[in-house]
């Protein structure tokens, strides 16, 4: 049942337009161009750290799939690309393999191939309110020898899904237990509706080490569930429900000291630069890599290399030699993102005057 649902999700994403109609919010963010960047583009360094591990670029292959025979090849190609490029990779929900050990190999193949990459295991937080505990979390981690455990928070999807689990009571308590008991860091991950500052603060207090905002602007799982069963009309109504990615980054970065993963509608290097300048640590990409991963790891690598080059150009044009420099560059927040910041009491003006270098001549 669970494995067939996973295949449904992949097929719908590939065959139907399930992208959000609401944008991720990066169109409201303007990086201030520097006509004299005072850097050599060839010297720009994309390396950074994520949860203590050095990676070659602030780009993550975000959680997509696993748990069905027909998607094993996708995970293989994603793993090859992650290993070659030294970037993190998150697997899809491992619940199917926890409940049916015959499906474990669709996940274990990832570590067999990506022996040095940063890997994130993945389970739904709602399962821990239904009986899962430390043992299941450890199984997921050990299955891929994971560097971290992502707990996905998907109340919207569960509410729309015909088989959905909607008892989210005591989930925060379960997150706290896992954060205290596991030897690897816990990442709280939304799946397309974003995370607000209130939840971000609570998650930090519960002990998570990173938040994946999973904002509005990319794939809509309400849309995916709508196409799975059109008799459930709510999917269409809630297609664009949630917090746009740029806004969610702003909320989480401003009110916590956690590492922020930006996912949800990120499609190019300029958006990556904007997300990092807003406070993200790394940016996750999923849907654009899905079709490519069905064909070959080379297509996945080509797409990620394109993103890296675009990010380098954006960094060059704002005078940033290192990823850390992006967090000091000037950016202007306009439009609905600015309106949101005002309504929520976030100081959006401070981002406009963070110039990396004051060039003194003579």
Located regions from the model:
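A gly/proline- and charged-residue-enriched helix-loop-helix capping module
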Residues: 86-125
């Amino acid at each position: 049942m669970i494995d067939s649902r996973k295949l449904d999700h992949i097929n719908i994403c590939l065959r139907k337009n399930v992208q959000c109609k609401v944008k991720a919010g990066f169109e409201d963010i303007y990086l201030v161009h520097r006509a004299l960047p005072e850097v050599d583009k060839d010297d720009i360094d994309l390396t950074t750290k994520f949860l203590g591990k050095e990676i070659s670029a602030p780009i993550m292959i975000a959680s997509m799939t696993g748990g069905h025979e027909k998607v094993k090849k996708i995970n293989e190609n994603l793993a090859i690309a992650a290993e070659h490029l030294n970037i993190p990779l998150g697997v899809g929900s491992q619940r199917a393999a926890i409940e049916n050990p015959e499906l474990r190999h669709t996940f274990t193949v990832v570590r067999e191939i990506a022996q040095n990459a940063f890997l994130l295991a993945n389970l739904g937080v709602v399962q821990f309110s239904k009986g899962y505990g430390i043992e299941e979390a450890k199984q997921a981690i050990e299955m891929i020898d994971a560097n971290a455990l992502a707990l996905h928070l998907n109340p919207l999807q569960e509410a729309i899904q015909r088989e959905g689990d909607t008892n989210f009571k005591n989930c925060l308590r379960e997150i706290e237990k896992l954060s205290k008991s596991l030897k690897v860091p816990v990442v709280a991950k939304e799946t397309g509706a974003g995370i607000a500052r209130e939840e971000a603060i609570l998650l930090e207090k519960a002990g998570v080490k990173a938040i994946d905002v999973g904002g509005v602007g990319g794939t809509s799982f309400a849309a995916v569930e709508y196409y799975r069963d059109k008799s459930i009309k709510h999917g269409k109504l809630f297609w664009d429900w949630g917090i746009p990615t740029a806004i969610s980054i702003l909320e989480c970065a401003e009110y916590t000291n956690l590492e922020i993963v930006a996912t949800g509608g990120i499609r190019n290097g300029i958006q990556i630069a904007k997300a990092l300048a807003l406070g993200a640590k790394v940016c996750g990409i999923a849907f654009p890599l899905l079709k490519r991963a069905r064909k070959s790891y080379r297509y996945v690598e080509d797409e990620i290399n394109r993103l890296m080059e675009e990010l380098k150009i954006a960094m060059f044009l704002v005078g940033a030699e290192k990823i850390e420099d992006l967090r000091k560059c000037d950016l202007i927040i306009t439009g609905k993102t600015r309106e949101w910041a005002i309504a929520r009491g976030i100081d959006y003006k401070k981002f406009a005057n963070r110039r990396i270098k004051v060039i003194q001549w003579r």
